[in-house]
């Protein structure tokens, strides 16, 4: 005589009501913020390096010149524009180097360390980019309008291509500044809420 024990299957298996997926962790929106952070960083890289490249290649020589005088406008004629090119290149370099930290924030959206590190450095480079963009904007304004009180004449009437390139570079740098502000606000909100 053999004894067998029949064990009935669980009611969940028979009826097909098992757990399909694990419940979502609260704060799953932080991963979305981290992905948006990465995308905005890519846009800021394009804006900052585009501004540096546009300003760095701004150069125009007037078609009329004499044996002794040649009229040329170039970014390296203005120390403010030199500062602009260097700082925008530094900002672009920082943004490239910050991409791995942004990826870590995507993989581990609840980690506070990478976000705090990015907020601190983003704030430092925001001030650098803002100072650079504002000083270049002041010089571009003088190039377009001049200053009657100091007898500075507007040069954009003669150097139109040069002024168009420098103006484009300044606009691009302010786009990078706005993206930095968005990055800082998004990271602060993601750190603040559970």
From Swiss-Prot:
Pfam hit, one: CASP_dom
Major localization class: membrane
Membrane-traversing stretches: 33-53, 83-103, 116-136, 169-189
Localisation: Cell membrane
Membrane topology classification: Multi-pass membrane protein
Keyword check for Transmembrane: yes
Keywords in alphabetical order: Cell membrane, Cell wall biogenesis/degradation, Membrane, Transmembrane, Transmembrane helix
Single biological process term from Gene Ontology: cell wall organization
Highest taxon, organism lineage: Eukaryota
GO CC annotation: plasma membrane
Cytoplasmic side of membrane: 1-32, 104-115, 190-194
InterPro entries given in the database record: CASP/CASPL, CASP_dom, CASPL
Topological domains, Extracellular: 54-82, 137-168
The protein's assembly and partners: Homodimer and heterodimers.
Family: Belongs to the Casparian strip membrane proteins (CASP) family.
Function noted in UniProt: Regulates membrane-cell wall junctions and localized cell wall deposition. Required for establishment of the Casparian strip membrane domain (CSD) and the subsequent formation of Casparian strips, a cell wall modification of the root endodermis that determines an apoplastic barrier between the intraorganismal apoplasm and the extraorganismal apoplasm and prevents lateral diffusion.
Record's protein name: Casparian strip membrane protein 2
Annotated organism of origin: Vigna unguiculata
């Amino acid at each position: 005589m053999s004894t067998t024990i029949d064990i009935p299957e669980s009611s969940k298996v028979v009826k097909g009501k098992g757990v399909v997926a694990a419940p979502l962790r609260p704060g799953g929106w932080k991963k979305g913020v981290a992905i948006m952070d990465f995308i905005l960083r890519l846009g800021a890289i394009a804006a900052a390096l585009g501004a540096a490249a546009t300003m760095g290649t701004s150069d125009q020589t007037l078609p009329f010149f004499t044996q002794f005088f040649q009229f040329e406008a170039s970014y390296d004629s203005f120390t403010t524009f030199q500062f602009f090119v260097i700082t925008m290149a530094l900002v672009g370099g920082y943004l490239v180097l910050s991409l791995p930290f942004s990826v870590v924030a995507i993989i581990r959206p609840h980690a506070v360390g990478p976000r705090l590190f990015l907020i601190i450095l983003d704030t430092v480079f925001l001030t650098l980019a803002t100072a650079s963009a504002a000083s270049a904007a002041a010089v571009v304004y003088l190039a377009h309008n001049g200053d009657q009180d100091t007898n500075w004449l507007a040069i954009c009437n003669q150097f139109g291509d040069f002024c168009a390139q420098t103006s484009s570079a300044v606009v691009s740098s302010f786009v990078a500044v706005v993206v930095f502000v968005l990055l800082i606000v998004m990271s602060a909100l993601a750190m603040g809420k559970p």
